[in-house]
Amino acid sequence: MTNIRNSHPLVKIVNESFIDLPAPSNISAWWNFGSLLGICLILQILTGLFLAMHYTSDTMTAFSSVTHICRDVNYGWIIRYMHANGASMFFICLFMHVGRGVYYGSYTFSETWNIGILLLFAVMATAFMGYVLPWGQMSFWGATVITNLLSAIPYIGTNLVEWIWGGFSVDKATLTRFFAFHFILPFIISALAAVHLLFLHETGSNNPSGMVSDSDKIPFHPYYTIKDILGLLFLILMLMLLVLFSPDLLGDPDNYIPANPLNTPPHIKPEWYFLFAYAILRSIPNKLGGVLALVLSILILAIIPLLHTSKQRSMMFRPLSQCLFWFLVADLFTLTWIGGQPVEHPFITIGQLASIFYFSILLILMPIFGTIENRLLKW
């Protein structure tokens, strides 16, 4: 009798993706983040579903409905904080996953990489709209400031902003449509993630050495299922430490004040995971230039494969590029810090220097260092 794993049409798909999948024998813990992102997505959909049962997307009742969830709904507080902090864990895993792709040259799988960039944009859009839903001060003003950036687009900008708002300001129509999009986007992300996996399994996984590993593969189960479960335990530990001990650590206190269009907070800023892009936006005095830099700070990932000059795929044996990569990581930490600071001296100058450094590393220095390393190895 044929094993059900190989004969049943549905079970066969699961088997070929998670059980009998041939995986390189040397992939490290950096390859855990793909599965962790899947777990984060499932967690966010489940907690979000339960929150949506009690939330009302109306400007008059949105804030009090979130309060009601935390105070009156059974375990509502833990569901709410798991959802809010789950988003932070999601982005930590995302940044690690993208960083691993850049370090080990996974961007040479062009279809997988490009769908990954689409996924990144979709997750960022979902997180932004989710931040608006509690209808606190930072929700309202964050929505106003970020959507207003689209008015920098020549000719159609103002009409586009009013079309997104559903009126002449951020109001009931905006909140309702943001809730609708925030609800549907995770399911679109799930579909995109399936396509991401489909293309990945066409080529097979990359590995730390960057070399073809077809001659040395092992089955995904039990070796990497056990390894992924360990990563999952760490993820749950970190999330629950955050949720149970300091649930508001990564949030903004201003969001506990109900939205008031007549009172602007002293310092409008997005959630921590957008601060690096926000710092790049603020570092350019021109509005359109800032918006372009903001979009390019993420879209630059699509250009990385075109700028790969090294004869080696991975940075594992390229010490110069390794130094540059960790400079880039330090630069992103600097940008994140600057994004949370007020717009005054010396933060403006530091932000501008960090922004120049960010684009210089990715567009100029990495290709140059790749060529230098080729010359040093006489290739």
UniProtKB/Swiss-Prot annotation:
InterPro entries in the cross-refs: Cyt_b/b6_C, Cyt_b/b6_C_sf, Cyt_b/b6_N, Cytb/b6-like_sf, Cytochrome_b, Cytochrome_b_C_euk/bac, Cytochrome_b_N_euk/bac, Di-haem_cyt_TM
Compartments it resides in: Mitochondrion inner membrane
Predominant place of localization: mitochondrion
Family matches, as Gene3D superfamilies: Cytochrome Bc1 Complex, Chain C
Keywords, sorted A to Z: Electron transport, Heme, Iron, Membrane, Metal-binding, Mitochondrion, Mitochondrion inner membrane, Respiratory chain, Transmembrane, Transmembrane helix, Transport, Ubiquinone
Alphabetized GO MF terms: metal ion binding; ubiquinol-cytochrome-c reductase activity
Example GO biological process: mitochondrial electron transport, ubiquinol to cytochrome c
Residues binding heme b b562, per UniProt: 83, 182
Pfam families linked: Cytochrom_B_C, Cytochrome_B
List of residues binding a ubiquinone: 201
Cofactor(s) named in the record: heme b
Residues that bind heme b b566: 97, 196
Domain of life: Eukaryota
Spans through the membrane: 33-53, 77-98, 113-133, 178-198, 226-246, 288-308, 320-340, 347-367
Bilayer topology term: Multi-pass membrane protein
A single Gene Ontology CC term: mitochondrial inner membrane
Cofactor notes: Binds 2 heme b groups non-covalently.
PROSITE patterns according to UniProt: CYTB_CTER, CYTB_NTER
CDD domains assigned to the protein according to its UniProt record, in alphabetical order: cytochrome_b_C (cd00290), Cytochrome_b_N (cd00284)
General remark: Heme 1 (or BL or b562) is low-potential and absorbs at about 562 nm, and heme 2 (or BH or b566) is high-potential and absorbs at about 566 nm.
Family: Belongs to the cytochrome b family.
PANTHER family attached to this UniProt entry: CYTOCHROME B
Function as written in the Swiss-Prot or TrEMBL entry: Component of the ubiquinol-cytochrome c reductase complex (complex III or cytochrome b-c1 complex) that is part of the mitochondrial respiratory chain. The b-c1 complex mediates electron transfer from ubiquinol to cytochrome c. Contributes to the generation of a proton gradient across the mitochondrial membrane that is then used for ATP synthesis.
Subunit annotation: The cytochrome bc1 complex contains 11 subunits: 3 respiratory subunits (MT-CYB, CYC1 and UQCRFS1), 2 core proteins (UQCRC1 and UQCRC2) and 6 low-molecular weight proteins (UQCRH/QCR6, UQCRB/QCR7, UQCRQ/QCR8, UQCR10/QCR9, UQCR11/QCR10 and a cleavage product of UQCRFS1). This cytochrome bc1 complex then forms a dimer.
Protein name: Cytochrome b
Gene that encodes the chain: MT-CYB
